[in-house]
Amino acid sequence: METKEAIIHVIVATAEWGKDQLRYRRHRLAEFLAAQEETKEVIWVCPAPRAQGKEFQEVHSGIRQFAVKDLLQKKMFRFGRYTDVFYRHKLSPLLDELTPASANGERCCLWYTFPGFPLLSSLYSWDQVIYDCSDLWAAPISGRSNLLSEFRRKVIKSAELRIIQRADSITCSSDYLHKEVDKKLTAGREKVHTVENGVEYELFSANKQAPDRSILQGREGIVLGFIGGIKPKLDFKMIKEAALQKPDWTFLWVGPDATNGDVSFQELLRLPNVIWTGPADPKEVPHYMELIDIGIMPYKQSPYNQAVFPLKLFEFLAAGKPVVGTNLPSTSKMQKPYVYEYVEGDHPIDFIAACEKVLGQNGDETYKEMRRNIARTQDWNCLFRQIMKYTGIQKHA
């Protein structure tokens, strides 16, 4: 019987594994790779604000974390993640760990899920370098621009260009990102593919647990829910106006506050029909889904959001819930009556009208099943198998 070569997958990620209790595309990718028969292990390489007690820490079955200490703890110094001189020497323990691999007949693949530590692609003889691009990294998430954000943009843009040019294959989570990557290549565009975000279908579609309605603080009626990281890219002002116009609706927010004290989010929370639960364990998210009538994705108009394809779209649909999204052009092709309504702009009347439209068949089992069927085609395992085909990694295992 033929013995497959063992593979070590090194994933460059934006943050430590358990930060904010959120699970992004990169976490699902790491777990998928760790579960493959030929995988020896996955190493999660990430920046960290402080030095770690151990160089390598097990964070999940088959996944170890190697954290690279930031230049300084303040956000303004994060440019060090993209500038070789500030991190090169900190990668030595990782390279030492990988050195015996080739001698043992093992293959090493490098996955970039954000454009940090670009020099790593040249410091080792990788079998494959893959860039899984899921954000417009150089654009400010808030949509605002200043001297500091312009400096940050240039540093990140330069780092990302190096990774794009070095990568053997590139996958993008939206058509917009695909086009942006294509612009940076003079040749080799055939190595770029679009693979949109997916869903852990069984987790969200099979939930039978009764929801804890005490979360709604005694409120009855229609519930609109946002579940995920609460960040400056969201349009809190528009939602505030909508909440004022629809006092009988409840606006439920589930997730960690990453707004850096955004005043508009704090003002929103003062309204009596707005509830914020704080962070939630990822395993509990399907239970929160049962509380809501409409999943909302209220994004601002900004260059950053042009590229976004939210994780939550297919999670809401897998739970049988209709969805309303704003200023997410990558999702406009998903529009379907009583399934997904897409709105451009920041007028609360348009948002309210879209919500009322999807409520037209609220509770109808035919439409619930239609939503689930759409989500079923986007199961993460199917999408990652497609990515593996594009890379050709398993073909040579």
Curated annotation (Swiss-Prot):
Membrane spanning stretches: none
Pathway: Cell wall biogenesis; teichuronic acid biosynthesis
Enzyme class: transferase
UniProt induction comment: By phosphate starvation, via the PhoP/PhoR two-component regulatory system.
Keyword Cell wall biogenesis/degradation: yes
Enzyme Commission number: 2.4.-.-
Swiss-Prot/TrEMBL keywords: Cell wall biogenesis/degradation, Glycosyltransferase, Stress response, Transferase
Gene3D superfamilies registered for this protein in UniProt: Glycogen Phosphorylase B (3.40.50.2000)
Keyword field contains Glycosyltransferase: yes
SUPFAM superfamilies linked to this entry: UDP-Glycosyltransferase/glycogen phosphorylase
MF terms (GO), sorted A to Z: glycosyltransferase activity
Gene Ontology BP term (one): teichuronic acid biosynthetic process
Extra remark beyond the main annotation: The nature of the anionic polymer present in the cell wall of B.subtilis depends on phosphate availability. Under phosphate-replete growth conditions teichoic acids are present, whereas under phosphate-depleted conditions, at least part of the wall teichoic acid is replaced with teichuronic acid, a non-phosphate containing anionic polymer. The synthesis of teichuronic acid is accompanied by degradation of teichoic acid and reutilization of liberated phosphate for other cellular processes such as nucleic acid synthesis.
Family matches, as PANTHER family: GLYCOSYLTRANSFERASE, TEICHURONIC ACID BIOSYNTHESIS GLYCOSYLTRANSFERASE TUAH-RELATED
Protein family membership: Belongs to the glycosyltransferase group 1 family.
NCBIfam families cross-referenced by the UniProt entry: TeichurnBiosyTuaH
Protein name: Putative teichuronic acid biosynthesis glycosyltransferase TuaH
Gene: tuaH
